[in-house]
Amino acid sequence: MGQGPAGRAGGPVIAVRPTPEQGPALHAEILAALPEFWGDRDVRSLHQPVWLRQFAGDAVVVRGGEVLLGYLLGVVTAGRLAYVQAVATRLPARGRGVGRLLYDTFLNSARAQGARRVEAVTTPANAGSVAFHRRLGFTAEPVTDYAGPGHDRVLFSLALTPLGPRRAEHAPGPGSYPGTPRSDLPQGR
């Protein structure tokens, strides 16, 4: 089970991948709590229902007891690309390992599905996201007009080392993620 950072939310901190049946309720829970994750930024457009309906099995949530501490909305494509649409940690839980637990869980699942690379994007003004992704080993490339004219973004990219018996013999290189492979990720709450 994905256990990680010490939480002050009244219970053990665990990471789970929601089921599609849980998607609509989780989507509503996230939308209702957006200010507690994103402050005054309007990020509703990042949270379309498809991320927790059709792609629920690739999403990750971290809870401390019944409190949602963080979530990651992502997908692993047939072309072996893992993409992170949104990752967020509740403001009071930042700096306690929740974001890393979200990524560890997602990347281990993506790796098990054969993903070779993961990508994510943010706005150039989001210095916290840029620093966080760099600490995880991502490269960060500014891309002019990435999201349309006048909408520049920073594209994060990270090579994933494959799962397998020989993995332990090879140290991860720059731009690769050294997370521990796991296949025991729980489904649902």
Task: Please tell me what each predicted stretch does.
Residues M1-A25, L158-R189:
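Conserved N-terminal entry element of GNAT/NAT acetyltransferase domains
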Residues E119-T122, R134-L155:
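Conserved catalytic-core motifs of GNAT/GCN5-like acyltransferases
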Residues L102, N126-S129:
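Conserved short alpha-helix immediately C-terminal to the canonical SAM/SAH-binding motif I
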Residues V87-R94, T122-P124:
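A short, internal acetyl-CoA/4′-phosphopantetheine-binding micro-motif in the GNAT/acyltransferase core
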Residues G97:
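Conserved G/P- and acidic residue-centered "switch" motifs that form tight phosphate/ATP-binding loops
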Residues P20-A86, R90-L91, Y103-T105, S109, ...:
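Acetyl-CoA-dependent GNAT
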Residues F106, R111, G128, G150-D152:
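Short secondary-structure boundary/hinge segments and terminal tails
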Residues A110-T122:
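Conserved GNAT acetyl-CoA-binding A-motif
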